[in-house]
Amino acid sequence: MEPLWGIFATPLLYYAPLYMSSAGLSSTQIGLLGSLFLALSFVFQALAGPVTNRFGRKRTTLWADLISWTLPMLVWAVAQSFAAFAVAAALNATNRIAGVSWSLLTIEDVRPGDRPRVFGILNLIVTTCGLLTPLVGLVIARQGITPTLRGLYFAGAIGMTVMFVWRNKITSETLSGVVARARHKELGVMQSLRHSLAEVAGMRRHPGLLGITTFYVLTIFLEQLSLFQILFLERSLRFSAQSLSYVPVAGVVVTGLLYALVLPRLAGLPVGRTLVLTRALGLIGAVALLLVPIGNLSVMLLVVSLLGGATFLTQTYREAALFARLPTAGAANLYSAVQTLALLCSVPAAALAGAVFAASPRGLFVLIAAVCTLLFGLAVWLARREGHQS
């Protein structure tokens, strides 16, 4: 089912900064939209666990997807002002509820040992949809970015809606979801929220959860800082939209190789050691991006592919590492709490990135390299701590 989401979302999210720029938004405004999205995401993330428990994983996923993707797709298709993009961002922020319910719907009934592979498959499916990006790039080269993406947004609204309804028909509620829904059935959303907060307050009781939570938060912060990568490649390194369309294709190749060759080899390693490897790759890529020669397509694709591979591995193993430390009871609340904390800490990231990029595009990517250094150090600490505990 995921390709019906990915074939639209992958190119649209990739080209979104260029689309907003073509609509007349400045880099500062784009950054503000990112922070607005994160601030509202924080609110919806706080409600994600209670809502998911109250209405069930399956039902919550359907309605949250329709609100967070179908509706904003239609708004983006006609947006011509900062206000319109802000409305779309507000609607899209509700995907934090869908993110929790869908993750639980997907993973709760899967054996812990198989979870990294499941996350890897899902990431691979979405990344593979990047193969369509050059086709979008060709249309952009002929028709322009604004009309091309407007049409794709309209098509995306239709395609995603079909997927959401279809997926809802063929999935079943998880066993944990049935239990949680029964427990929260008589509670209102606010009562359920208070119940959830009581469980979250006991986070310290779960060994290793605070450490992996810190790692999780920093990776989300880093992803928000990286929002301007495509603008950096276009403006500072002078790559055309057609050249940039090959970036997702390179990402597909790297992700496929990682999934086929690397994930099986990492399966027997402790999670902490895999996080060290992924963040070492991320640090090398972040530094290398600062050294890419202007207009050198081959070097750029190599470096961005390295960064994409590091992101793929990080997203795969950070989720697996987090779920490994979550108790069966209250998983929805604690998973939602970790993401809520990540969003809270990341709210200023997009605005900060926009301000730094406006002042010095290269300066932003020096900052990103510094965050990558911090993440690598944290991964090493987590691996050592994991070794001592074992």
Which residues make up each language-model segment?
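Juxtamembrane intracellular "pre-TM" segments in multi-pass secondary transporters
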Residues: 173-211
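Central cavity-lining transmembrane alpha-helices of secondary-active solute carriers
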Residues: 32-50, 249-262
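Structural signature of the two symmetry-related core transmembrane helices
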Residues: 59-74, 273-288
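C-terminal membrane-cytosol helix-exit motif in multi-pass small-molecule transporters
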Residues: 158-180, 378-383
